Amino acid sequence: MKKLLGINDKADINYHKFEVRLAARAVAVRHDGEIPLLHVGEGDYYKLGGGGIEQGENIETALRREMLEETGCSIEILRDIGYVIEFRTEWKLIQISFAFLAKVVREVSEPKFTEKEIKEGFRLRWVNLEDAAGELLNEGTKNYQAGFIVKRDSAILEEALRIIKTDYHGRLF
């Protein structure tokens, strides 16, 4: 899998005491060319669907579970996009996000946000794939976490767009 980006807010830090979190994320395209973005009210930014890989899960299983929970959608994973490593020194966290290109197979239910996500004001919004990068970049500089998420998801989306244009001749459907 191709490394897309390394995000580090401080140089020359000893990371041996940092927690490592693995996550799976998707650019999931619906038949009408829209993708789900999650708006986070607390911080006023957008992010791609996906989340942490739980004990005993593989990356693909975690991604399908997270996309169903956060977007209410069943997905078909088409291929990997790449990975992003974030070094969040304020939180003593190294997060590695594995990103995939997917098709939305069907919309199964409403999102089932966690208590934390509800408290943070998560809201699902469908956005045209071509417009999604603008949504990500227009937001997200209002808190520490958002700065990482916007950089991460923008890199993932940029590579997904490149893959769709070159490998899929601009169309997944």
Model features per residue range: what roles?
Residues 1-25, 31:
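Acidic, metal-coordinating catalytic segment for phosphate/diphosphate chemistry
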Residues 28-31, 102-104:
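Active-site beta-strand termini and strand-to-loop segments that position acidic
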Residues 30-69:
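Conserved Nudix-box catalytic region and its N-terminal flanking loop in Nudix hydrolases
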Residues 53-76, 86-140:
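Unchanged
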Residues 19-21, 43, 48, 95-97, ...:
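Short connector loops at helix/strand junctions that flank enzyme active sites
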Residues 25, 34, 123:
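Conserved beta-strand and immediately adjacent loop positions that scaffold enzyme active sites
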Residues 44-45, 109, 116-173:
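Nudix hydrolase/Nudix homology domain
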Residues 79-82:
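Conserved S-adenosyl-L-methionine
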